[in-house]
Swiss-Prot record:
Protein name: 5'-nucleotidase SurE
Record-level GO cellular component terms: cytoplasm
Co-factor(s): a divalent metal cation
Family recorded in the similarity comment: Belongs to the SurE nucleotidase family.
Cytoplasm is among the record's keywords: yes
Source organism per UniProt: Prochlorococcus marinus (strain MIT 9301)
Length: 269
C-alpha cells in the first residue's frame, strides 16, 4: 500500500515507551509519522479540553529518532489532536493512532480514557482513528503490539474504513507465541468498588486519593451482536480484542421503557 500520513498521540505522555514503539512500528512499515502528545502523563482525563490556560508546545524529535517529527503539548490528549489538526500539521492525516496505552481500555472505561478520547477527536474530524492498549500496567514490551496495531489499521484503511467508526484495540499482556486469534468484541460493563483514602496535609486540612478496585464482570457484554464475546473475556483468554465504537451515544434500548414525561410544567395554564 502507499505510505500513509499518520498522526500519533496518547495519554501516557511523550516519554512513554508505548508511543515510541507505535511510532517506530509505523515508520518501519514505510509510513510518514508525526507525533503530538501530552508533555507529561494525562491518563484518565477523558475528553477534557483546556479552556482556562494557554496551550504550549515544545519540539520532541530527539525522543523518537530520525524521520519522526514530534511535539509535546501542555494540554490533554484531545487538545493534542485538535491542535495538531488545526495548527501543527501541514496536511490532514490519513490515519490517527492513539497509544500504545500502558494498561487496558476495556468496556465502560473508555469514557474516562484519554487514549480513546484522542482517537475519538480524530473520528469527530472524519479521520480514521484507532485507540491501542496493552491490557497491563506492568507490561513493558510494546513492539509486537505496535506491529499488530499497524497491521490492523492498514487492513481497515484498505477496506473503506467508515468515517464514523473508531476502533478500540486491546492486546493481551503476554508473549507473542501465547497470543491467540483476534475477534470483534462488544464493550463490557466495567464496574468499580470506589475507595477513597482520606489523609491530612501539614496544615490539618483533609484531602483524598481515589483508588478503585475493578469488580470482574465477564457476563455483561453491553450492546452489540449477541454472538460476539465481551472485550474483557477476550483479554482474559489471551485473545486480541477489537471493538467498533462511534461518537453516537443515543440510547438503543426499547423506546417503551423510557420514562413517561409530560408537558404539564411547560407554560402551565
Amino acid at each position: 500500500m502507499k505510505p500513509l500520513n499518520i498522526l500519533i498521540s496518547n495519554d501516557d505522555g511523550v516519554f512513554a515507551a508505548g508511543i515510541r514503539a507505535l511510532a517506530k512500528s509505523a515508520q518501519k512499515r514505510g509510513h510518514k509519522v508525526k507525533v503530538v502528545c501530552p508533555d507529561q502523563e494525562r491518563s484518565a482525563t477523558g475528553h477534557g479540553l483546556t479552556l482556562q490556560s494557554p496551550l504550549r508546545v515544545e519540539k520532541a524529535d530527539e525522543l523518537f529518532g530520525d524521520g519522526i517529527e514530534a511535539w509535546g503539548c501542555s494540554g490533554t490528549p484531545a487538545d493534542c489532536v485538535k491542535l495538531a489538526l488545526s495548527e501543527l500539521l501541514d496536511n490532514k492525516p490519513d490515519l490517527i493512532l492513539s497509544g500504545i496505552n500502558h494498561g487496558p481500555n476495556l468496556g465502560t472505561d473508555i469514557f474516562c480514557s484519554g487514549t480513546v478520547a484522542a482517537a475519538m477527536e480524530g473520528t469527530l474530524e472524519n479521520v480514521p482513528s484507532m485507540a491501542i492498549s496493552v491490557a497491563s500496567f506492568k507490561w513493558k514490551n510494546f513492539e509486537y503490539a505496535g506491529e499488530i496495531a499497524i497491521n490492523i489499521a492498514e487492513q481497515a484503511i484498505n477496506d473503506n474504513w467508515p468515517a464514523s467508526l473508531l476502533l478500540n484495540l486491546n492486546i493481551p499482556p503476554c508473549a507473542k507465541s501465547k497470543i491467540k486469534e483476534l475477534s470483534w468484541t462488544r464493550l463490557s460493563v466495567r464496574k468499580y468498588k470506589n475507595q477513597f483514602s482520606k489523609r491530612e496535609d501539614p496544615r490539618g486540612d483533609d484531602y483524598y486519593w481515589l483508588a478503585g478496585e475493578v469488580v470482574l464482570d465477564l457476563k455483561s457484554k453491553g450492546y452489540g451482536p449477541k454472538n460476539w464475546p465481551s472485550d474483557v473475556s477476550q483479554i482474559q483468554n489471551n485473545k486480541i480484542s477489537l471493538t467498533p465504537v462511534e461518537p453516537d451515544l443515543f440510547w438503543r434500548g426499547n423506546l417503551d421503557d423510557l420514562p413517561k414525561i409530560n408537558n404539564s410544567f411547560v407554560n402551565p395554564s
